[in-house]
Amino acid sequence: KIPCKSAFGGIKKVLFADYGGITAVVVDSTTKEATITGTPTWYEYDVKGSSSLETSVTSSRENGTTFYTQTLNLTLTYLDAKTQSELQTLAVARPYIVVEDYYGNNFLCGFENGMECTGGTVVTGAAAGDLSGFTLTFEGMEETAPYFLDTAVSPDAAQIDPTA
């Protein structure tokens, strides 16, 4: 059955945690949603508009291999020193990333191998309407597509407010 044309794309928020804090992922055989165990600390960034998560599958009959490349393109629209400091740490780390879309779906990226920053920019813009902020690309190669989580993860209470 073809669904109605009411889809709404985009990412609402992105959460990062240190790699190694999740001890297991259990996938429900009926719902196919996953539950994570472990207690990583999650750091949240609210995003809107120009961030995206894309997963591509690469499969080779000749080699007998299949893997999924998870790519997060992240745009943060405010330039400040505290956020820059956190992003510099993320750029050299290999975090887990949870992406929440506008339907409330939470996707766990990088469970087996972590996600790695493959590039980005710190930009002031040239014109009044240009981006003044950060762009980062994170990529992970996994045996599965990102897991749909059965519940949202809770962010740490100490979050950066770039406008404060």
Regions found by a protein language model. Name each.
Residues 81-88, 147-149:
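Short, conserved charged micro-motifs
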Residues 60-82, 130-144:
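Oligomerization/assembly interface segments of phage tail-like spikes and tubes
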Residues 114-164:
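Mixed-charge, glycine-accented linear interaction segment located at domain edges/termini
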Residues 76, 99-101, 111, 140:
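Hydrophobic side chains in beta-strands
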Residues 21, 41, 52, 79-81, ...:
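Generic "edge-of-domain/loop-turn" microfeature
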Residues 64, 87-89, 98-99, 126-130:
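A general structural signal for short secondary-structure junctions and capping/turn motifs
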Residues 1-73, 115-128:
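Solvent-exposed edge beta-strands and adjacent loop segments
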